[in-house]
Curated annotation (Swiss-Prot):
Provenance organism: Staphylococcus aureus (strain NCTC 8325 / PS 47)
Keyword set, alphabetical order: ATP-binding, Cytoplasm, DNA damage, DNA repair, DNA replication, DNA-binding, Nucleotide-binding, SOS response
Origin superkingdom: Bacteria
Subcellular location: Cytoplasm
MF annotations from Gene Ontology: ATP binding; single-stranded DNA binding
Protein name: DNA replication and repair protein RecF
């Protein structure tokens, strides 16, 4: 999977710009606040129909403009195809091959990306919410079924929380509706949990050898999925549903008193263990960075396995955060295999032969200078 061209109109600090992309490495050089990260963000947004930096799409529209547009031409093994995204102050519209998609679940997955930025180090040391978002963003790109199940779960979770709040305040008294919601909640909670557990298992199988390679076999990495709803995965679907319903039933009074759902995938977490120790609590900064790098490289391989195409890699000012050995391992792994976009203030710190086959663009105040 390659991005051949990227066109922006009224996106952030860009007026109109077209980037003809190199199939291997594209390096965007410039001082801070010139638009390097905005350009990478536009590729991410084109892929996932949402920014990783803001939940407010209006912020993506250039000041005093009415709309923003992102368009990219992609090449796959079987041919080329354009993707288009229009953003207005009333909403957004996405197109695949010039055909409007009525649902985002039909759109997401045509362009797969892996983003690695300094804040991604928080996947290890940050909050459970960051790790849940990581699962949803990566798994959602390779499984439209997961995206749909997650959307249904979030819809029912919102309904259930609203009803629990009404019960807590005494505005509702009938528990029959809560039981109905719990039945629907359990069905999609099980589906989301199942797919997350399988994803983490697959990711671990790829991350372990990568981590061992980076550390010269001095460290062993393991990933542990920590679901809020604990049930026996070996059971059949009916037995698992019954087990989840039992948990929800036993805690119905607690949830009513608290006015919120206390169990479900929205409270899941992942732990990353290095040599049997939790990297979040006991890992050094170097171990946490190696773990994050191993996970990102494993994502790339997993996407290729699942969809038959390597994703596009977005490295947002992250090379400066990696020491020479980690940087070399990253660049050697992706060389001639993964189309990559790199933002940096200087290429002086990039000491790798990958530079011999890279295209450099200088970014200055929302303009691209070759």
């Amino acid at each position: 999977m390659k991005l051949n061209t990227l066109q922006l109109e009224n996106y952030r600090n860009y007026d109109e710009v077209t980037l003809k992309c190199h199939p291997d490495v594209n390096i965007l050089i410039g001082e801070n606040a010139q638009g390097k990260t905005n350009l990478l963000e536009s590729i991410y947004t084109l892929a996932l129909a949402k920014s990783h930096r803001t939940s407010n799409d209006k912020e993506l529209i250039r000041f005093n403009a009415d709309y923003a547009k992102i368009e990219g031409e992609l090449s796959y093994r079987h041919g080329t195809m354009p993707l288009t995204m229009f953003i207005t102050k009333k909403g957004k519209q996405v197109k695949v091959n010039h055909l409007e998609q009525s649902r985002l679940t039909q759109y997401i997955g045509h362009l797969n990306v892996v983003l690695f930025a300094p804040e991604d180090l928080n996947i290890v040391k940050g909050s459970p919410q960051i790790r849940r978002r990581f699962i949803d963003m990566e798994l959602g790109q390779i499984s439209a079924v997961y995206l749909n199940d997650l959307a249904q779960y979030q819809r029912i979770l919102k309904q259930k929380n609203n009803y629990l709040k009404q019960l807590q305040l005494g505005q509702k008294k009938d528990l029959t509706m809560l039981e109905v919601l719990n039945q629907q909640f359990a069905e999609y909670a099980m589906k989301v949990t199942d797919k997350r557990a399988h994803f983490i298992q697959e990711l671990e199988s790829l991350a372990k050898p990568i981590h061992a390679g980076i550390t010269n076999d001095k460290e062993a990495l393991s990933l542990n999925y920590l679901p809020s709803l604990k049930f026996d995965y070996a059971q059949n679907e009916a037995a698992r549903l019954e087990e989840i319903m039992s948990i929800l039933s036993d805690n119905m009074q607690r949830e009513k008193e608290r006015g919120i759902s206390l169990f479900g995938p929205h409270r899941d977490d992942i732990s990353f263990d290095v040599n049997g120790m939790d990297a979040q609590t006991y890992g050094s900064q170097g171990q946490q960075r190696t773990t994050a790098l191993s996970i990102k490289l494993a994502e790339i391989e997993l996407m290729n396995i699942e969809v038959g195409e390597y994703p596009i890699l977005l490295l947002d000012d992250v090379l400066s955060e990696l020491d020479d050995s980690r940087q070399t391992h990253l660049l050697s792994t992706i060389q001639h295999k993964v189309q990559t976009f790199v933002t940096t203030t200087s290429v002086d710190g990039i000491d790798h032969e990958i530079m011999n086959n890279a295209k450099l663009y200088r970014i200055n105040q929302g303009e691209i200078i070759k």
